Amino acid sequence: MKPEISVVMAVYNGETYIREQLDSILAQLSDTDELILSYNKSKDRTEEILREYERAFKQVRVVECLEKGVQANFENAVRNARGDYIFLSDQDDIWLPEKIEKCKRCFHETGAELIMHNAYIADEAPGSIRDISVFQGRITKKGIVRKMLKSSYHGCCMAFRKSLKEKILPIPRGPFFHDVWIGMTAEIFKR
């Protein structure tokens, strides 16, 4: 059965935080959804942890990215995604419990091809989430040049429809990260 949700993550040297993030995502996935973990060869125990999760959860697929770098690693993850909705994830985040459900509702209500949501910043201390959002009060304004100069796109806060996938691939290697590329591409091709 084809997944409705694909969560994609680029992973490198992430053993310190990755378990907590994987658990926060897996708690929200159905049995038919998928979590794509694309990794570059790490110097720590990251690959071992990924393989452990792959054995324990049928939603998890681990794919190696032979090209080094975050852009190539995210591209590899997105290429392997099969879901109708693709969520980007960083390896050191923790997802709030209703993130996927709220984003799905937003897709259905708006018909948007790409959505962005708020985020909170936390430090290494347990329970250290600030009560003020990092993006609160920042309005995303129209205009490609403005987006290029001051990015309003943050991959950890981004989800998009499968229909955008063919437009964003391949992700160019260059001055912009994958999330800026995806956001600008969505803006160019918006309905």
Model-derived segments and spans:
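A conserved acidic beta->alpha catalytic loop
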Residues: 24, 39-48
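Short aromatic/hydrophobic "clamp" motif used to bind/position activated sugar donors
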Residues: 86
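Conserved nucleotide-sugar donor-binding catalytic segment
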Residues: 143-191
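Conserved donor NDP-sugar-binding/catalytic core segment of glycosyltransferases
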Residues: 100-129
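Short, well-formed alpha-helical segments that are part of the catalytic scaffolds
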Residues: 14-27
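Short beta-strand/loop segment that forms part of the nucleotide-sugar
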Residues: 33-41, 63-65
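Cell-envelope/extracellular polymer assembly enzymes that use nucleotide-activated donors
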Residues: 3-6, 34, 181
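Glycine-rich, basic loop-to-helix element that forms the pyrophosphate-binding segment
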Residues: 65-81
